[in-house]
């Protein structure tokens, strides 16, 4: 169609599967514009995109894990993204709790009985810790969610889950034949690319963080005498603290091994060790933390996230391209993940304070260029591990 416009005129184009009366379209369009957020800064764009990931219905709100093919309401993705999409985006504690409450109701099976995401239920701890730091309502939050977290911890007791077992040394052993039981869960021809059966470094780091947090909260706000939870799990916490570092730390290599299977230590330098040093409760000594951060900085950090595998490893694949099989082989064998920058930057600020500010700015400023390119308001889940990414 064509139209002649004079200065000051406007035209509204409306598409519909049904014929509609054009009268009132201009008013509807104007009303729609008024409801839209003003996007003037990069932060405005990120906040707007955060809002797009919230799937709101009359009785619940869930998180879409990613456009265009990931599902809505996934356990790990919701737990990890929830503080950023709510608390740090708009400060909405009510929305945070609404989404979390829906997730807990939806995910009873994975949270308390069985899951192929062995560490995901334990990551609820980190989400609650962030909520406490943001709101300052420690007692109130523990009163509401404490039973849920304690139930999750209890579900890792011996004999409760098929996919993970707590050993006498307090550590969690994860194994199911031909099944990937961590976030590194790509498959090729029906077989996991990174199976990682045994003691996984990040799963046991999340385990220790959960135990320490729950025990401390129960000591503060639980029963003061004969607290069965504290009495049962304090010795386990101490066992994990005692055995974690000897199991995973290699002083001669300067990093924590990725997983251990019957005494064999996987030598791959991966970002999973980051969670052993960045969580509120760390199971390793300060000297180990410094060495681990140094190794991660030297081998994994890029301007688009942390690589999933060091380029020095012969299995490293630095470019995500080719067939679906080629891409699945590269997915956790070298691709850089932006989400891993957050815990890395967090631990670096803890160690170096404001002296790390310029470096943090350098590591994040590149994403603002991408916001105006590929995703239009968002950036990618992963990037090539090789420059220019």
Residue map of PLM features:
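Conserved small-residue packing positions in alpha-helical repeats and bundles
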Residues: 208, 215, 274-277, 345
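Inter-helical turn/loop segments and adjacent helix faces that build the functional surface
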Residues: 131-144, 213-232, 287, 351-354
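Aromatic- and glycine-enriched pocket-lining scaffold segments that form the walls
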Residues: 155, 199-238
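Beta-strand-rich interaction surfaces with strong enrichment in secreted/lumenal proteins
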Residues: 1-3
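An alpha-helix initiation/capping motif
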Residues: 118, 147-150, 227, 231-242
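Extended glycan-interaction surfaces of carbohydrate-active proteins
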Residues: 5, 11, 18-20, 26-73, ...
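Aromatic-rich carbohydrate-recognition surfaces in CAZymes
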Residues: 76-78, 82-181, 185, 200-204, ...
């Amino acid at each position: 169609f064509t139209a002649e416009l004079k200065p000051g005129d406007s035209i509204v184009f409306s598409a519909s599967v049904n014929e509609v009366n054009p009268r009132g379209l201009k008013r509807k369009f104007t009303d729609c514009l008024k409801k839209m957020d003003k996007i003037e800064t990069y932060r405005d764009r990120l906040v707007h995109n955060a809002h797009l990931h919230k799937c709101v219905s009359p009785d619940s709100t869930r998180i879409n894990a990613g456009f265009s093919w990931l599902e809505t309401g996934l356990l790990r993705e919701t737990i990890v993204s929830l503080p950023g999409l709510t608390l740090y985006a708009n400060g909405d504690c009510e929305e945070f709790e609404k989404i979390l409450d829906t997730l807990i109701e939806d995910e009873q099976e994975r949270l308390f009985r069985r899951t192929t995401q062995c560490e995901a239920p334990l990551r609820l701890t980190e989400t609650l810790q962030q909520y406490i730091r943001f709101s300052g309502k420690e007692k109130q939050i523990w009163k509401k969610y404490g039973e849920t977290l304690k139930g999750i911890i209890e579900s890792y007791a011996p004999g409760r889950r098929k996919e993970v077992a707590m050993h006498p040394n307090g550590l969690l052993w994860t194994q199911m034949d031909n099944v990937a039981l961590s976030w590194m869960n790509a498959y090729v021809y029906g077989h996991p690319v990174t199976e990682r059966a045994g003691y996984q470094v990040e799963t046991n780091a999340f385990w220790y963080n959960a135990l320490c947090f729950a025990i401390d909260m129960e000591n503060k706000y639980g029963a003061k005498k004969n607290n069965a939870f504290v009495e049962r799990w304090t010795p386990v916490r101490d066992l994990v603290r005692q055995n974690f570092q000897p199991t995973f730390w290699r002083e001669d290599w300067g990093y924590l091994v990725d997983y251990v299977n019957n005494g064999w230590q996987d030598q791959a330098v991966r970002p999973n060790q980051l969670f052993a040093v960045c969580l509120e409760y760390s199971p390793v000594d300060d000297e180990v933390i410094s060495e681990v951060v140094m190794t991660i900085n030297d081998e994994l950090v890029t301007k688009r996230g942390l690589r999933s595998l060091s380029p020095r490893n012969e299995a490293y694949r630095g470019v995500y391209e080719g067939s679906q099989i080629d891409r699945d082989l590269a997915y956790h064998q070298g691709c850089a993940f932006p989400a891993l920058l957050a815990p890395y930057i967090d631990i670096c600020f803890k160690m170096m304070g404001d002296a790390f500010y310029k470096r943090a700015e350098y590591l994040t400023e590149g994403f603002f260029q991408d916001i105006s390119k590929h995703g239009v308001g968002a950036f990618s889940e992963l990037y090539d591990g090789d420059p220019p990414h």
